[in-house]
C-alpha cells in the first residue's frame, strides 16, 4: 500500500517568489499529488484554489506561524479553508515559546484556543515538530506533554522525521507511537557527521541562534532516499499508523544542487518504492 505524496512548498520558496504559477505547474509535472503551503506569496485564496484545480494538485495543509494564528485565527482558518486545505499546522516555536521557558504553557494554551476555532470550521490542526520539543520535563518529552495536554480530536501530529532523528529518537517508532493521530508525515532526509548536532543548526534553515557554526560538512539536508533515514521503514510506519499523506520537505538543497532538482530526486526515489 502507498499513500499520496505532497510537497511542502517551502522547499521551493525562491522559485515560487520568482514564478508562482510556473513553479506550481512544475511541482505537478514532477509527480506530486498535493501541496502543503508556507505562505501564499501575495496571492488570493481564490486565485490559488483556481490554479490548483486547473493543475490537479490537492491543497493538503498549510504551515502558519503560531503568532499569526493567535492574532488572526478566524481570518487565516477561513482563508485556507477557502483554498480547500484539510489541515493547518503549527510549524515552529520561537525561542520564547519553547519547552523550558515560561512561554511553553502559553504555547499550549494558545494551541488549545486555535484548535477550537479550527474544529468549528472543519479544519484539523497539526503540530509540526523540530528537535527542541525532545527536551524532557519531569522525565517526559515536551512533545508528548503537548499531545497529552491537547485532546486528540483537537490536535494531531505532523511528525517531521528528520528532526526526530536529529533528536536521537527513531522516526518510525515515533510515528507508530501516535497511530491514529498521525494523518500527515513529513519525509525529510539528512546527513549528520556525528551524534552531537551543531548548536547553530537552525542557521541552515535561515534562523539565527547561538553556539558553534553549522556547516554542510557536519550537517546537511538531503533528498529523500539520499541520506541516513530508513525511508522504507518510515513509509511502512506511516501506513500502519493510519496516515493519509506523506509530505516531502527539504529546507535547503545540498551544496551544488538546486531546490527543484532536490524535490525531483525525492519524488523519483519514492516512485522506485511504488509511491
Protein language model features and the residues they cover:
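C-terminal/domain-terminus segments
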Residues: 243-273
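Active-site acidic/histidine proton-transfer and metal-coordination neighborhood
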Residues: 34, 66-157, 166, 177, ...
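Conserved beta-strand positions in the central sheet of alpha/beta enzyme cores
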Residues: 36, 61, 89, 126, ...
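Acidic/histidine-rich catalytic cores of soluble enzymes
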Residues: 120-228
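N-terminal pre-domain/capping segments
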Residues: 1-87, 156, 236, 267-275
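Acidic-and-aromatic substrate-binding clefts and catalytic sites of carbohydrate-active enzymes
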Residues: 13-18, 34-47, 64-73, 95-99, ...
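A short, acidic, amphipathic alpha-helical segment used as a generic capping/interface helix at domain edges
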Residues: 226-239
Amino acid at each position: 500500500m502507498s499513500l499520496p505524496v505532497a510537497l511542502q512548498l517551502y522547499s521551493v520558496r525562491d522559485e515560487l517568489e520568482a514564478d508562482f504559477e510556473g513553479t506550481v505547474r512544475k511541482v505537478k509535472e514532477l509527480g506530486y499529488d498535493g501541496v502543503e503551503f508556507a505562505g501564499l506569496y501575495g496571492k488570493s485564496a481564490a486565485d490559488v484554489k483556481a490554479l490548483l484545480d486547473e493543475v490537479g494538485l490537492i491543497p493538503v495543509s498549510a504551515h502558519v506561524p503560531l503568532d499569526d494564528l493567535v492574532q488572526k485565527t478566524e481570518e487565516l482558518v477561513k482563508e485556507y479553508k477557502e483554498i480547500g486545505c484539510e489541515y493547518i499546522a503549527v510549524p515552529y516555536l520561537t525561542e520564547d515559546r519553547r519547552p523550558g521557558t515560561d512561554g511553553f504553557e502559553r504555547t499550549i494554551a494558545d494551541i488549545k484556543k486555535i484548535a477550537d476555532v479550527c474544529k468549528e470550521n472543519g479544519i484539523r490542526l497539526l503540530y509540526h515538530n523540530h528537535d527542541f520539543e525532545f527536551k524532557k520535563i519531569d522525565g517526559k518529552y515536551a512533545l508528548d506533554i503537548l499531545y497529552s495536554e491537547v485532546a486528540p480530536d483537537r490536535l494531531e501530529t505532523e511528525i517531521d522525521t528528520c528532526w526526530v532523528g536529529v533528536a536521537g529518537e527513531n522516526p518510525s517508532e515515533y510515528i507508530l507511537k501516535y497511530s491514529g493521530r498521525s494523518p500527515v508525515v513529513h519525509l525529510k532526509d539528512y546527513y549528520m557527521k556525528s551524534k552531537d548536532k551543531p548548536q547553530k543548526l537552525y542557521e541552515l534553515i535561515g534562523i539565527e541562534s547561538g553556539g558553534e557554526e553549522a556547516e554542510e560538512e557536519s550537517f546537511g539536508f538531503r533528498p529523500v532516499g539520499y541520506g541516513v533515514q530508513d525511508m522504507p521503514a518510515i513509509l511502512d510506519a506511516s501506513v500502519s499508523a493510519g496516515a493519509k499523506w506523506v509530505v516531502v520537505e527539504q529546507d535547503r538543497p545540498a551544496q551544488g544542487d538546486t531546490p527543484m532538482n532536490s524535490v525531483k530526486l525525492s519524488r523519483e526515489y519514492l516512485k522506485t518504492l511504488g509511491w
